[in-house]
Amino acid sequence: MYARLAFRHLALRPARTLLLLGGYGVGVAVMIVLLSIGEALLAQARDEKLVGGGDVTVLPEGIDVEVMKTGGLGGMYFSIDHARFIQLQLLASPRLAADVQAVAPQIDGTLLYLRTAGGSERTVRAAGEIPSATRAVGALPALAAGAWDDDAGDARWARPTPAQLRDDIDHFHLPPDELTAAERASWAEWHYFNVLSADRKRWAFITLLAGGDIPNGRWGGETLVTLREEGKSERRFVAYAPSSAVSLSTTRVDLAVGESRVTLLPDGRYDVHAIARAANGSGDMVTVNVVVSPAPRAYFPGAALGGAIVSGYAVPALRADASGEICASGACERFDAAQAYHDHNWGVWQGVTWEWGAARAGDYTFLYGRVDTPESDRGSLILYLVDSLGFRSLFRPSRIAYEDARTISVNGRSIRVPATARMIDVRGDDTLRVELQVDDAIGTDMRRGNERGGRGAAMAHPYFIQMKGSARLTGRIGGHPISGAGAGFFETYR
């Protein structure tokens, strides 16, 4: 009977009947699609590779979750750069302690190549986790047998001691094999320290450097010390050492250059000892014996560049104190918890110039910089800001607005140098304004070398300008105002 009624209705009103049947079919199709999507979402919500046992999963920017799950080409080699820095300074930092209970880093499905003792090579997929962290976020897998606990490598990654952290970011490097002979000859790597007296009138630049075709070519080391009193001439001291008198490590901070050395103490402080003779041939000596104590969490983990230039830069002690003694020409000055700074540079520096500065500003400390090469446009300028809880924010000012209203003499030539500088940036709701006032400046003709390690024979801007001055910052971060003032050192080229 129902079939007869349906066919009669179709015969009497075929258009309306077909429209109703079509609508019903579309409705069924939509329902099937929605149920399929819901099932997929439920499966993803239960997938431990995505959930990780916690409330939030952090993935690299731009990664497609479906591509990652299916192993597509776009998900083969993704990674989070400086993952340990993100863990220690962001996700597991004291700043978020009230909101983040636990953090667990995980590597899943990484492609590795395994070479057996017999010489054959196989491709394998590997995963990595830190057991204690995975347990803390509730994602510990069921163990059929045995135990799964942190080993020494896990503990060093997740909970490094101050000394371990600095060994990891402040060790030395060997020149890459792909460098040309000329590039290997211009390779240089150094520890740099500066120390400022309590009245901000006297300061020292201290560098221990290894350079050349390390380790099998022609290379050696230098110790360079510059002492300066505001408004007076600088005193430069230098000592050279052959490669046989240089000891460096690709896993540790420690460096020895002749009679000078930088030694990392077990508690993460730096013992700096330097001996050098006056560069003017007078025979005067300088002896540096200071211990540099980095402030907790005030460091920049490092960045490496490739392409037109091969270089790297890390700041293990963005904010630090120095205690000890510097003696020159028979007179000694004692420093007790004096403002100090330490960075580490490596790479090929032929013809390279830079903008750089680091200063305290009240409770804040900032670092800014940019590297420029003759073959490329200007690099990107960044400003890195920390406070007592560690990393605070990263800004990218478009430029440094210098006012070259000072004049200094370099080898008898008058050079115009900055008297003030200004940087401004707005990133979303966050704002920053930094104003620099230069109190003192010295210049070096880079064709003659300097204690910062750069070298260049034919540079458009060959005069390396080192400045000491005051800094003031203002702005807002995360809806809160920030401000501070202090002193620092700045560098540019003219």
Named regions from a protein language model:
Residues 1-31:
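N-terminal Sec/SRP start-transfer signal
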Residues 20, 25, 29-33, 74-77, ...:
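A short N-terminal beta->alpha junction/helix N-cap motif
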Residues 22-24, 59-61, 106-108, 129, ...:
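Acidic/polar N-terminal loop/beta-strand segments that form early-domain functional surfaces
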Residues 32-125, 132-135:
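Hydrophobic, regular-secondary-structure patches
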Residues 68-71, 115-116, 137-140, 205-208, ...:
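Short, glycine/acidic-enriched capping/hinge loops at junctions between secondary-structure elements
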Residues 131-145:
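Diglycine-centered glycine-rich loop/turn motifs
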